[in-house]
Amino acid sequence: FQAEDGIRDLVRSRGLGDVYKRQIVNSFNSTKILKFVIRYLSIINHRTLITLLLSLIVPFCAYNFEIIYNIDLTLISIAIIFPLVFAIRGAFKRREKALEFLSLHRGAIKTISYFFMNSSKLPDDAKNEIKEILNDLSDSFLNHLSQSNCNTDKIDKKTELIYKFIEKHNEELSGGVKQKIFRFIRDVHVSQENLIAIHTHRTPISLKAYCLIFIYMFPVIYTPTIINKIGLENPVGLTYFVIILSEFILISLYNIQDQMEYPFDKDGLDDIKLDYFKNAYKKV
């Protein structure tokens, strides 16, 4: 809304006609709507296409070959729903933990910076140096989380620079200040190690594979039972609708879980906005 008000102020200040004003504002609104739609369609991918094809092919074969039976679907429902719900809950907890440790990481780095800035014996050049070290560590670590690389050697070396800086300016920092700084360096290490663990280790692959296989198998088992319940005398389109809708719901939940499981890659709707956790310090 603030951006829209800015557009309106801009066209008003430049003396454009009412028609041009409306065109610019409408174009801006259309762009917002388009981006909104694209974001919410991000859960549709190749797996959605596979399930759609299965939902069309299986009923076609069932009707043509008259494959109809009536079985209890409780077991197959448990086989899909239980691992799917378990995986979604696990992905949600991972995301919440990631937010918790990102906040801890940012807070610890900012607090460390405050201790250095309040050290009266520390020269301005040294204060600027430690600011650059902390900025570089924050940016590098968050960039590392957004990538698939699991090697943390560079991050470890950048974190170690804080300790080397303390050693270098040992006489200019009081013992009490150093103890407090080390306390928050520990928080930096704890948050980094936990975030690296979240970044590296995912939901058990075997569980996800098991869940996906049964989602693909679901139309094969489910379709003849639906035909039996609906009846051959009822419209064929009703069977297709039920199968397609059921498969779309299941695969969409699976895709949401898959996106939520990678909270740092900026690919899903619920991905964490890492830029909000960066530290930007001005030089003294």
Label each region the model flagged:
Residues 1-23:
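Single conserved hydrophobic/aromatic residue that forms the stacking wall/gate
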Residues 22-103, 230-236, 253-254, 258, ...:
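N-terminal juxtamembrane/topogenic regions of multi-pass membrane proteins
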Residues 26-46, 176, 183-213, 265:
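Membrane-interface, cytosolic juxtamembrane amphipathic helix immediately N-terminal to a transmembrane helix
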Residues 83-133:
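Juxtamembrane/interface alpha-helical elements of multi-pass membrane proteins
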Residues 112-207:
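Structured inter-helical modules in multipass membrane proteins
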Residues 182-185, 233, 243, 259:
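Soluble C-terminal extramembrane regulatory/interaction domains of multi-pass membrane proteins
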Residues 200-205, 225-233:
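Hydrophobic alpha-helical bundle architecture
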Residues 209-229, 237-253:
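Bilayer-spanning, highly hydrophobic alpha-helical transmembrane segments
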